[in-house]
Amino acid sequence: MSPSSLSSRTTDQPALAEAETVRLATRHLRAGLTGPLAEAARWGAVPLPVGRFSLHEIHPKRDLALLHAWMNDPAVAPWWELAGDEEVVRRHLATQAVYTHTNAYLGCLDDEPISYWELYRADLDDLARHYPARPHDVGIHLLVGPAARRGRGIGSVLLRAVAELVLRAAPDTMRVVAEPDVRNHASLAAFARAGFRHAGDVELPDKTAALMMRARTARESGARR
């Protein structure tokens, strides 16, 4: 993997064939979780130093080819393990659509799709068996897709922004967590620059992960009142 790549993914989930047919026959990839994370596409655009950033629902017919290209990038494939034909990515999207604690989004800068996101309730995920989870912990996965966008600090800017958006939208959430592979040095550095701290390593079924945490600050806690 190139040190300029940024990606992080959770442990594998089983494919749900019946649900795929139902979900992907719809106009867009429906958010799985009711509540704040399911409304991320309605959070609106936020101005950042790198452009105006916004999250959007994934439309499989429109977005599958793009995501397939990103996942087959040699710098990305070892970390996300979704290389192959479009069916591999389609099944992954279908799985994200049917699990009730996770939501997948396309992230845009100035209306250009440049990132793939998974926001999920970490306390309801298999990950919770491997670390001291707290109620309403939110997990985050990010892939910066275009190679030209990597290695320029964009990933850390986006991670910081999305963590802040999550904490603003979900007042019961006190922590945003991530579990990148310990070998993914670019991802670890991006999370650190975005304000996440390394809370130790955890052994997951498919990797040794660095547990990265971004806790709600005192100022953000005051804003909840």
Language-model regions, residue ranges each:
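Conserved N-terminal entry element of GNAT/NAT acetyltransferase domains
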Residues: 2-61, 221-224
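Hydrophobic pocket/interface hotspot
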Residues: 67, 140
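Helix-loop element at the rim of GNAT/NAT acetyltransferase active sites that forms part
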Residues: 69-83
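Acetyl-CoA-dependent GNAT
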Residues: 94-139, 147
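C-terminal "cap" of GNAT-fold acetyltransferases
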Residues: 136, 204-225
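Conserved acetyl-CoA-binding loop-helix of GNAT-fold acetyltransferases
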Residues: 151-166, 189, 193
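Intrinsically disordered, low-complexity, charge-dense segments enriched in Lys/Arg
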Residues: 167-168, 179
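Conserved beta-strand-loop-alpha-helix junction that forms the acyl-donor binding cleft
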Residues: 176-188, 205
